Amino acid sequence: MRLIFAGTPEPAVVVLSRLLESEHEVVAVLTRPDARRGRGRTLHPSPVSELAQQHGIEVLTPATIKPNTPDGDAFRARLTELAPDCVPVVAYGNLITEDLLQAVPHGWINLHFSLLPRWRGAAPVQAAIAAGDTSTGATTFRIDKGLDTGQILGVIHEPIQSTDTADDLLTRLAYSGADLLVNTMDNLAQGIATYSEQIGTATYAPKITTEDARIQWTHPAEAVDKHIRAVTPGPGAWSLLGDQRFKIGPVSVAEESDLQPGHMRIEKNRVLVGTGDLNIELDQIQPQGKKRMKASDWARGLQNTEGLVLS
């Protein structure tokens, strides 16, 4: 089939790479415009844009795809000219309007990193880890006008390990999900795809803000650990020590329970922090404006280790 691939971040690159190895023809990619990154705030293309350029594939970067806008109208004209059979989508980042959904024979097919209808929304991997789910997966579905409510075309399952960060889990899902999406494209091309309605209670995973990533030390140690892993590497779990922000993680749950929530104790090679029940041991810490380091190395540089409280 002729495809326009819609995606933006690194996990989408894994999927695009797999599509480029398949029998399908990627005639263009649709991705977010170049964004400013780094200390110099210089413009950089999205990861998907970079891969497409390496393969000589046309890159479409409208600021919006809404109708009756210059960018949106130009995209619609190019969509008609390219005449794709299907538009596979992986974390594109823009709302797809209903007229566009109906403009492609096989529609816009999304690869979503959860077992729908559980964890609809922008942060399904993070939500699964934070909730303590022991398994998750990926779903391909035809996008409709709802939020991740469309008919399902395929699923794969993935166990969640007790040490998984969001990055660990998303990396595995990107690779297994890439195979799922190619299989879905194959089935659509061969006319053997089957659609099924989503069954079960829907739960939601909204985008995680920096404030959401702040550690609540009054929560139980296991919940603190899950929270930290869920927001690693981005936006990154953090806490304040005085007026300085520290990024924290990974951590491990200790056996002791003698510290009050947020209170720290420095031992020879350990940095312990109290939670709502057991203490946790910090493995790594990143002071504001500095590189990540071992928590024990950071502690050795302190002049005063008494009365330290994270909040």
Curated annotation (Swiss-Prot):
One of its GO terms (molecular function) is methionyl-tRNA formyltransferase activity. It catalyses: L-methionyl-tRNA(fMet) + (6R)-10-formyltetrahydrofolate = N-formyl-L-methionyl-tRNA(fMet) + (6S)-5,6,7,8-tetrahydrofolate + H(+). (6S)-5,6,7,8-tetrahydrofolate binds at residues 114-117. It comes from the Bacteria. Keywords: Protein biosynthesis, Transferase. Its EC number is 2.1.2.9. Gene3D superfamilies: 3.40.50.12230. It is an enzyme of class 2 (transferase). Pfam families: Formyl_trans_C, Formyl_trans_N. Coiled coil: none annotated. One of its GO terms (cellular component) is cytosol. Belongs to the Fmt family. Attaches a formyl group to the free amino group of methionyl-tRNA(fMet). The formyl group appears to play a dual role in the initiator identity of N-formylmethionyl-tRNA by promoting its recognition by IF2 and preventing the misappropriation of this tRNA by the elongation apparatus. This is Methionyl-tRNA formyltransferase. It comes from Corynebacterium diphtheriae (strain ATCC 700971 / NCTC 13129 / Biotype gravis).
